[in-house]
Amino acid sequence: MAVISMKQLLEAGVHFGHQTRRWNPKMAKYIFTERNGIHVIDLQQTVKYADQAYDFMRDAAANDAVVLFVGTKKQAADAVAEEAVRSGQYFINHRWLGGTLTNWGTIQKRIARLKEIKRMEEDGTFEVLPKKEVALLNKQRTRLEKFLGGIEDMPRIPDVMYVVDPHKEQIAVKEAKKLGIPVVAMVDTNTDPDDIDVIIPANDDAIRAVKLITAKLADAIIEGRQGEDAVAVEAEFAASETQADSIEEIVEVVEGDNA
């Protein structure tokens, strides 16, 4: 049974790629057709690769892997944070700070500073400090939480990194590759897939598409850690047991949506 049905992918708009003039030719094999100047992703391949990504993430989690979710654009930020937290993992959903992985020692010092400021507030230190100094500390904490809050409790460099839009997150992907960290990613038609270990061909610009894929990978982590029974199965999910919609039906939907 496919972990994501063709129907779910269609409803979330996962099939819409970028304008044809913005494509990366290396994504050609994942593209089904072109309609009205927009590339249409082959969802039969997305179904297959989503299954592979699910299995990869589940198996990694079963071996106690630390997973870092990365998605800093506005369409991804909320889903990345919510699903990372739901699956007990870590996230970066604002600007990626260069050296987050390759200069982990320095990042740990900044995280330690964040924790120190929090302790100062909790133990009453703020109450005896001048208001001006407290204001500066709060400003520093807010900034540190914005960029590092999602990895504040990450015990080590991640074993796996999941990325929404590796075209935008090129620095993060390069750091992961330098350290030998496998990358699972939603890859749109404008992206070079060469540095991605586990590819999910998908529209990475639609909020619903990002939420669907990201939530399913979070489910994989939960299953890997807690077993299949821990994953909540949606009522319509059983429909994915049936034969996937045909390519012709996909074209009809796409033509209708782009009319």
Curated annotation (Swiss-Prot):
Q: Which GO terms describe its cellular component?
A: cytosolic small ribosomal subunit
- Family annotation (Gene3D superfamilies): Glucose-6-phosphate isomerase like protein, domain 1, Helix hairpin bin
Asked if the keyword Glycoprotein belongs to this entry, the reply reads: no
User: What does the record give under GO molecular function?
Assistant: structural constituent of ribosome
Q: Belongs to which family?
A: Belongs to the universal ribosomal protein uS2 family.
Q: Which HAMAP family match?
A: Ribosomal_uS2_B
**Know the name of this protein?**
Small ribosomal subunit protein uS2
Q: Identify the gene encoding this protein.
A: rpsB
